[in-house]
């Protein structure tokens, strides 16, 4: 297993201090638990169902949530959608979806309900660390709209677009910049 250095672990600490794992498979949950503890997690809570996951999320106020995509009494997309549209303090917390069903459709579905990262099974410790690093050290803007609540789905927004403006707000921003 990869052993990250202390400075890296210190940068992850605010995100990985309290972790919620929602997975009906005890072995998979144990693997994620062990990896998160090696990254400095002080408190890891595991739940097997969507309903319990939502209850615990409200009480625990985790810094990071892992959810399996599907299982008995668990729909990871429904969990994430409900969390994102709730009034819980943790509604903006990074969610990493874990599944063996990594198709374009499932990845798009997860992205469209507000999942930050997608982790395909089987995965290595390096795969998990990379996802945790992405959510902890490369935060994305938050978007709230009628049909979507979650992190900005544009992962690689350079902000250096120099083409024609297409929105009224773009034109207004351009006028302010010229003034």
Regions found by a protein language model. Give the residues of each.
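CheY-like receiver
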Residues: 7-12, 137-179
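Short amphipathic alpha-helix used as the core "switch/output" element in two-component signaling
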Residues: 9, 75-91
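Conserved acidic segment of CheY-like receiver
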Residues: 9, 15-36, 46, 65
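A short, hydrophobic beta-strand element within the central beta-sheet of small alpha/beta folds
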Residues: 20, 65, 91-102
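Short hydrophobic/Thr-rich beta-strand motif most characteristic of the beta2 strand and flanking loop
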Residues: 41-48, 56
């Amino acid at each position: 297993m990869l052993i990250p250095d202390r400075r890296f672990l210190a940068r992850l600490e605010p995100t990985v201090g309290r972790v919620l794992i929602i997975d009906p498979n005890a072995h998979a949950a144990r693997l994620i638990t062990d990896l998160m503890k090696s990254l400095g997690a002080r408190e890891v809570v595991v739940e097997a169902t969507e309903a319990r996951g939502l209850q615990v999320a409200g009480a625990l106020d985790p810094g990071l949530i892992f959810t399996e995509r599907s299982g008995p009494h668990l729909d990871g997309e429904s969990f994430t959608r409900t969390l994102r549209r709730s009034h819980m303090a943790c509604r903006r917390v990074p969610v990493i979806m874990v599944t063996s069903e990594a198709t374009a459709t499932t990845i798009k579905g997860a992205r469209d309900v507000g999942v930050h990262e997608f982790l395909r099974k089987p995965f290595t410790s390096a795969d998990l660390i990379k996802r945790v690093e992405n959510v902890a050290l490369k935060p994305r803007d938050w978007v709230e709209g009628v049909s979507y609540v979650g992190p900005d789905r544009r992962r690689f927004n350079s902000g250096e677009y120099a083409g024609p403006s297409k929105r009224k707000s773009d034109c207004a921003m351009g006028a302010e910049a010229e003034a």
